[in-house]
Amino acid sequence: HEFSYTKIFAKVSSLFAPLFFNAGYIIEAAIPRFFKGEQDVLFLAKYKSSERQIPEYDSFEVFQNMLVNVPSVNKMQLDNDFSIRKLTIDDVSSMIVVFKQVFETYPFPIFEPLFLTESIQENKTQYFGISCEGNLIAVSSAECDNAEQNAEMTDFAVLPRYRGKRFASHLLSYMENELFKSNFKTFYTISRLKSLSMNRTFYNSGYKYSGTLIKNTQISGNIESMNVWYKNISTNTQE
């Protein structure tokens, strides 16, 4: 009440759902087998303003039309002119250059060298990139919960002149393969509703849509609705 927030958001284990339901929270999305490949997680919300609950209907319509179509799962090889790898502390300055050209604002301080350096050193986040002639042109990251064996696939940024080459798909596939080696069991993302290309990337990569967080995240200068996608992994199947 002190800051006049119009939405309260919580990501909690389904074990605690009754407490939140009793306090007036509603489910906006859910991911099964989120914790160690066993316990589900719920994305809950409590609104203080009816206006905050109104989604961007135009973007919703475009997104739903995408879901009607069968996903395209054709795998493409990365062109020999480009290379993909895991990034290190030595790449931080180049990462910031890419992020600043893609995002006006961001929910986390990805423009700050110290934030990126510490997240890499503490093994909280793994960063990946695509380079051309030694220059970093695309970045993504996996925010890893090593104890619970899940990872958020996020921070996808491709320099404008290199878009249209499915770099996000290549980065996503590379991240999945690297994390699978470390026994991660659930991958997920929270993607901007209005970014049809990113939603299509996860749809075509076998992720399942599980809900939309209405006007949830401050990004690129606005508070936007976000779609939740997930993929459960096991040694034998992908769900």
Specify the residue positions occupied by each region the protein language model found.
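Conserved GNAT acetyl-CoA-binding A-motif
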Residues: 2-12, 179-191
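Conserved acetyl-CoA-binding loop-helix of GNAT-fold acetyltransferases
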Residues: 1, 158, 164-181, 200, ...
